[in-house]
Each structure stands twice: as C-alpha cells, then as structure tokens.
Amino acid sequence: SATNYEAINFYHEQFGIQRAVLPRVLALPQIEHVVNNTPVEIEVFGYGSLCVMVEGRCALSAYATGLGPNQHGVCSPAKSVVWEEKPDGLSTRLAGYLIDRFATGERAGYPTVCKGRYVVGGERYYAIEEPASLDTLALLPEFVRIGVAAIKIEGRQRSPAYVAEVT
C-alpha cells in the first residue's frame, strides 16, 4: 500500500502507473497532500469495512493462513475459509482457527481474524476490533474540491447482494 506521494511518484516513474488507490486509513488532509504532489490520478475508498491493519499488511491473516494479502490479493482468502453448519448454529474458521460462532438465524459476516468474536476471560466479544464501516458520502464535495479522481466501493469478499445494496 502506498500512503504517500513519494511512493506513488516512484511507481509512476518506474512503472508508468496512471492511477493509485489510497488506503482508507488516510485522513482528508493527507489525501489532499498526496493529490497536490503527484501527477497520478488518486482514487479513494468511499464505502467499506475499516481495519486496524494498514491495508495490504494484515499480519493476523498472514499468520493464520500463511498467505499475505499483498502477495495473494486478499485478507482471509476464500480457500482458507470454512463454514461449519451445526445444530446449534454456524461456526466460521480461517485456516482451522475458530473465528466466530453464530446462533441459528443470526447473520454471519465474512470471517476475518480482526473482527472475530472470541471468548476471553469467560466473556464473548470482539477482542480486537468491532466491525465498523467507512461511509464518506458526506465527504464527496470535499473529494471533488481536492481533486480526487474516483471513489472506490469495496466489493472483494462481498456477496452480489452486498454490492447491489451499497451501489
């Protein structure tokens, strides 16, 4: 993930990139600083899941699966995910690690290590991070003002129903 204009300019000069997607962890002033200092078109996430890791550098997923997101394109790769339907509900596992259990009829999200619910000290909760979403609808005028070229809506690891709902 490139988080600054120097890195983006390097990829532009060395590989001729024309557009870069910034990680969703950057604040508006940081995005503006990048836009103002590179000839590369800048795309930002407008909607999607937030993460405690810098995008593309998920150490938790890489540890659990042996597959780093930068090299394999995704956190919690589908080939490492197992859904186990049992009489008392649904269990989700990533590379054999139990990520979450859902009661019968409870909505189940895609299993990621950072957003799993775990039993810690006898209590079941989101031990690392509660699921949260990025929604930049209110920032669209600012994105236009600072020169953002495009808005990205997360779709990888999402069902067609999810993509249809948010677009």
Which residues does each predicted region cover?
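Active-site pocket-lining/capping segments in soluble small-molecule metabolic enzymes
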Residues: 1-6, 21-150, 157-167
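Structural motif
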Residues: 14-15, 146
